[in-house]
Every structure is written in C-alpha cells, then in structure tokens.
C-alpha cells in the first residue's frame, strides 16, 4: 500500500493531471474538456481544488493503481477486485466521450474507410481500459500442429476470480433485473454492482443488418484480435434461420475485413448466452480457415467443400451472396429434419429439435465464404451431457460447451489449468508428489498416461498433450467422425441436398 501520510493531495493532483494528459494524447477528450474532466475527478475523490501542472507521461495502469490505493486508504472502497473494478471504471468514465460522440466519430471514419472506423473504436476500447489489456496479456497461449492443422490454445486468465468474502457479499447484495443481461444495450453507462460489472466506459455502434437493428461492441475479454459482439437491440432469444444468415452477410458487406459467426441456438451445442440474440466476429485467422477439402461439389455456381475438420463442416464459396444464402438455408432446413440412427443422429424426439448449425461467414477476395457446421445436442444415459459434447474422460481439461470460437479451432481453457499444469510438470520431473496435490485428482488417469511418454522438453510436451486433448474434445463434438463410417454418413446427408 502506498504511504499517503505526506503530500497525498499533491500526489493525487499529479495523477489527475497525468490521467487528463493521457486522455488528451489518445483523443478521448479535447483541450476544452480539460477543466470539466478535472472537476469530475476531484468530485469523485472528494477533493476541493485542482491545479494544472506539467507532468511526466505515466502508464494508465500506474495512474489507476495509485488512485485505487488512494480510495482504499481513504475508506472509499474495500480492497477487493470487484470494488476496484467498479471504481476504476467510474474513474475512466470521467474522461470518456459520450456515446453519441463515439457513434458520430465512427460514422465519419466509416464514410472514409470501414477499417479506419473499427480501428478507432477498438483503440478507444483499449485506451479506456474497457478492455483490460493488462489482464489479457496474462493469458497463456500457444499453437501446435495436429492432423487437422495448427490448433490454437489459450488458458484464459483475464477474468479475475473472486475471493470467498466477495462471493458472500455478492450473494447478499440486492438483486435486480436491470439490465436484463450482460448484452442488453442498457448496459451502456451502467455503474455496475457486486453482481454486475461496471459498464460506464462501454460504448456501442448501431447497425442496420438487413432491416433489423443490431449494435456493435467489443468483448471486454477479447479472446482473439478485435473480438467483437453484434447484438440485437431487443432482448430476444437466439434463433437460427435464413434471417440469421442474412444478418451475417449484411455485417460482412459492411466490414469485409472481419469475419462473423453465430453460436448454435440450442443448449449443449450453443454458447453461454442463449437468451439474447447475438453474433461474434473480429479480425483473427482461425485454424479452421486453413482446413482442407475432403470432397468437393458444385451447386448453382457455389463450390461446396466437405472439410477435413473434427466438426462436420460444409464450406460454401461463391461470388454470389444469394446463391450461398439459398444453399445454406437448404442445408440448415434439411439438417433440421435429418436423422441417421446408425450414427446416433436423431433430428427430433418427442417434439424437441436436436439438430442445428453453427454458421461462420467471411470474405475471401471478391467471394463470399460460409462454413456451415452441423450440430446435434442429443443426450443419452451413457452421455448425459451430450453425445456430441466433450466426453467425461476429457472434462479434466474441458467440459464446457463447444461454442463458435472453439469450433473454429481456438481453445478457451479454464484458468485453473495454469496452476494444475505446472504442478503436473513438477510431478513428471520428479520434483513433487502427485498425490500431495488434491486438485490434481481429476487428472489422475491422464497423469498415468503422461508418465509412460518420452519427451525432451516438459513444457513443449505438456503443450502438445493439452492440444491433443482439445482436438479429442472437438472430435467428440463432430456428428460425423473423420473415419470411413463417418465420411460415408456425411456423404449420405450431402446427397439429400441435390
């Protein structure tokens, strides 16, 4: 903790100046805003005067750390991650442009170049600490080659874990239904609480997608470069139909330098939020894009490739957007009623639909390209969490739904693995006893296998083994396996399309 006994007022005055200079330098405020923003900040901290001074440049993280420590020392907040996050968002809001200013700047830049507009918006999201880059930089990431190509792995450390006291306090906090969910447009400017993150630095850009109003924002956790979310202005559930595909293509027409996709609309094979219609996009090269074709067809000027990929995928490529849309709709509607009981694929049971798709759209030169990934969410006694879902022998690494991002070959693995994998390395190296770590019990069977393997570098070895596990998880999620039986089944389905 910083010692505030001496000159604390002068130190805070300096930090406020440094924050204002940071905001000026990064185009968040203009010179005419300086006094206004200074007054917002001194009011926030209960300070009664401010003096402008020449200051040395300082990182935003150092500035915020000082201000948060000051607030803890003064009893404004408790020394917890949640309360600090609520306050530092409130601090940054004092130097944020209003939502209308952001929208107008975006539109002005867009009229010149769509990429300039998204560059501005993404930079603002980073500069404002809405995207907490200092935390995201802690994520562990690596890539290793497998039979399907390079697979990307991340261990996500950007969401801080709450301590028991925070959890207890949050449990006793007043519960509200406003905003209805984390995606609703009403989050813009929301101060947050112990159960809902502050969103005062959150900004959104309205979009017309084929006559429907959506909004563009960036994910505060950016799982990949320029990870954006495009959400419906209304709090309405996810759905999958032709209009979904039309929205994806409309987005790509507006932002051809981005890709976009949608999670499936059913539990188990869908994402974590099914209650609010949304898509995810960004500017990142996913492993799936390099997948090779096993078989190729042509249908009404559309090239159709059956991909060599763990999840069963048909890739549609054409200069004609309408032809791709028509064929994608036909694939989806046919798949929704298609069954192949020999491969455990049953479309409907007791009036409940099990088949759906995960669609992904991108531009490749002048051509439209759409990946249609076939999904099924059936459960059985043997597989109560899903037949085409990570199986129990892999849950020690990944047990969550395989959503859009994982479908494309980017693993988002839980933070616990950072510590657990390091402990396993120590055990493999003979520097620790496996049974002295209770949290490793879930890895016991895997560890027994790892002990039988030969390797020269334990770090590289463990990365490769984690990659193998993730690939196995993706293969579990594929409705048609990449073997003779599976490919024959896949071909039978494709033949029903023409």
Where are the regions that the model predicts?
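Generic alpha-helical secondary structure signal
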Residues: 242-246, 321-329, 468
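Histidine-centered divalent-metal-coordination microenvironment in nucleic-acid enzymes
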Residues: 226-232, 270-286, 373
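Helical scaffold of the NTase/Pol beta-like nucleotidyltransferase catalytic core
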Residues: 200-205, 233-260
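Active-site microenvironments that recognize anionic phosphate/pyrophosphate groups
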Residues: 5-230, 234-237, 308-310, 325-328, ...
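Catalytic or ion-translocation cores adjacent to nucleophile or general acid/base/metal-coordination motifs
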Residues: 252-272, 281-339
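Beta-rich nucleic-acid/ligand-interaction surfaces
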Residues: 267-275, 350-355
């Amino acid at each position: 903790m910083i010692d505030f006994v001496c000159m604390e007022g002068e130190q805070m005055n300096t930090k406020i100046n440094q924050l204002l200079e940071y905001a000026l330098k990064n185009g968040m405020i203009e010179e005419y805003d300086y006094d206004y923003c200074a007054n917002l900040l001194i009011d926030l901290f209960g300070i009664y005067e401010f003096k402008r001074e020449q200051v040395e440049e300082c990182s935003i993280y150092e500035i915020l750390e000082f201000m948060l420590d000051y607030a803890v020392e003064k009893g404004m907040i408790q020394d917890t991650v949640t309360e600090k996050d609520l306050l530092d968002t409130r601090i940054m809001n004092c130097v944020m442009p209003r939502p209308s200013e952001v929208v107008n700047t975006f539109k002005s830049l867009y009229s010149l170049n769509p990429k300039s507009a998204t560059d501005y918006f993404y930079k603002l999201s980073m500069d404002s600490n809405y995207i907490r880059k200092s935390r995201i930089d802690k994520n562990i990431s690596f890539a290793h080659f497998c039979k399907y190509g390079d697979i990307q792995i991340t261990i996500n450390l950007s969401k801080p874990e709450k301590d028991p006291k925070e959890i207890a306090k949050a449990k006793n906090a007043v519960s509200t239904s406003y905003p209805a969910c984390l995606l609703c447009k009403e989050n813009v400017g929301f101060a947050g609480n112990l159960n809902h993150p502050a969103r005062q630095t959150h900004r959104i850009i309205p979009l017309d997608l084929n006559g429907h109003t959506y909004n563009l924002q960036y994910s505060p956790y950016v799982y990949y470069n320029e990870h954006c979310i495009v959400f419906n202005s209304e709090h309405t559930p996810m759905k999958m139909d032709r209009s979904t595909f039309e929205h994806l293509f409309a987005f790509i027409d507006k932002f051809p330098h981005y890709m976009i996709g949608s999670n499936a609309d059913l539990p188990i094979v869908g994402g974590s939020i099914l209650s609010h219609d949304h898509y995810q996009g960004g500017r990142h090269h996913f492993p799936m894009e390099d997948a090779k074709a096993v078989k190729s067809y042509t249908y009404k000027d559309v090239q159709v490739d059956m991909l060599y990929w763990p999840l069963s995928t048909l890739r549609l490529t054409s200069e004609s957007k309408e032809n791709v849309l028509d064929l994608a709709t036909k694939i989806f509607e046919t798949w929704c009623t298609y069954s192949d009981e020999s491969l455990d694929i049953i479309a409907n049971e007791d009036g409940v639909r099990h088949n759906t798709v995960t669609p992904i759209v991108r531009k490749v030169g002048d051509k439209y390209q759409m990946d249609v990934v076939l999904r099924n969410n059936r459960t059985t006694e043997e597989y109560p969490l899903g037949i085409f879902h990570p199986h129990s022998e892999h849950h020690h690494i990944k047990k969550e739904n395989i959503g859009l991002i994982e479908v494309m070959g980017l693993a988002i693995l839980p933070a616990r693995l950072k510590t657990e994998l390091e402990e396993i390395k120590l055990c493999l190296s003979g520097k620790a006893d496996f049974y002295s770590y209770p949290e490793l019990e879930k890895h016991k069977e895997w560890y027994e296998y790892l002990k039988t393997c030969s390797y020269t570098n334990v770090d590289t070895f463990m990365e490769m083994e984690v990659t193998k596990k993730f690939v196995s998880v993706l293969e579990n999620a594929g409705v048609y396996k990449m073997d003779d039986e599976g490919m024959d089944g896949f071909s039978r389905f494709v033949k029903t399309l023409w």
